[in-house]
Amino acid sequence: MAGPAHWAEARDLGAVGDGRFLNTAVLNRGILELSRSGGGTLHFSPGVYRTGTLWLKTGVTLYLESGATILGSTELADYPETPPPRPTGRLEFGRYALISAVGQQDVGIAGRGRIDGQGSNPNFSKKALIARGWSPVDAYLKRPYGLSFVQCRGVSVRDVTLADLGFWCEDYLDCENVSVQGVNVDSWKPDWNNDGIDVDGCRNVRVSNCSFRAGDDAICLKASYRDCEDVTVTNCTASSLANGIKLGTASNGGFRNIAISNVALDGVQESGITIEIVDGGTLDGVTVQNIAMRNVTAAVFIRLGDMARSWTTGAGRPGIGVLRNVSISDIVAELSPRGNLSTGGSITGLPGHPVENVSISNVRMALRGAFPRGARIDPRSVPEAGANYPEHSMFGPLPAYGLFVRHVRGLALHNVVFSGGGGDGRPAVILDDAGRVDVDGLRPDSMVVLP
């Protein structure tokens, strides 16, 4: 079926691009034959190819020409369950997916075409499924991901558009040598759980020149059961119904050598930059620089918590983790707070478990406060909330309009400027149980240090 160059045309295999014919069997047979012949490219000429789950195999790339669409079926029965990877547990992966690869090597998706999950169909709505009698857990888990790569080596996704997916848009779990380049994700849904991209416990990953419109976290790194390390994210744009750039929450593993740069965020309902360890892992060595934010609720949220979830079977309850060595620089943020949550950001650890060595430099935050003029909040009234799910809004209104810092050892604030705040009576910065603090160029210089 494939010529000497191992190139196969989907239509030549019997695929029909009319948007009605179900191509699942034809396309999976072609993928399998290509892989068995040593690998190659399955080419999609312009047309709309309706399908259920496609199982991507070693050595195979799907190439979608401009005008070609892989259209996900709206029938849940067309998405068989993917066997869980090892280690087993409550891992987040594509149990059901439009395109799935498990334990494969040198796989890819490319071209200027489109992958459309038809996620707006009621069959993919949690609310609609629960109304039909589904349990909340099944309504959450049994919707199909867009792309799901599990324990793969050598993954390339480039130039395609991922639109209207039923669940997470693209997920990479325990993969190595991953390149995601020039991908446009457009899945802005109010049903939540439409993350733009999730990179969980992967090594050597580069995400570049991508755009994300996501109904949940836009760019999300996780470490459910192993470290996420050697990851770069650069030259991307994002909007989100949740967080813009996020590390966490799943974190039995940790984060090492993570570099995020040159990202423009416009329209983020939670925090622009969110960095979390709440499941016992270690975050050590994260750099975030050159980030522009507009219409973002909060700029920075750094949290060491104690949700203490175990993501693998038999792992036991994890202890409190470690969050240290974070550098955030060259940030311009125009904040549009929701309700009375008018604060630029927060950095919080737990008693006896501080966040360590955070540097924030060359930052400009313009705040438009909705806080009552002249109002103040007692800093001692802010709850610890160690076991709560971490979001910038978890503490309620904060006593500082710029930055609230608690349980931190090693903090550098250099050339940090807040504008538009201060009329509500709160100071710009509050330090509570903070040691080894170096402040230079803070404006306005209204900082309260609690004993």
Region roles according to the model:
Residues 1-451:
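Extracellular/periplasmic carbohydrate-active domains that bind, remodel
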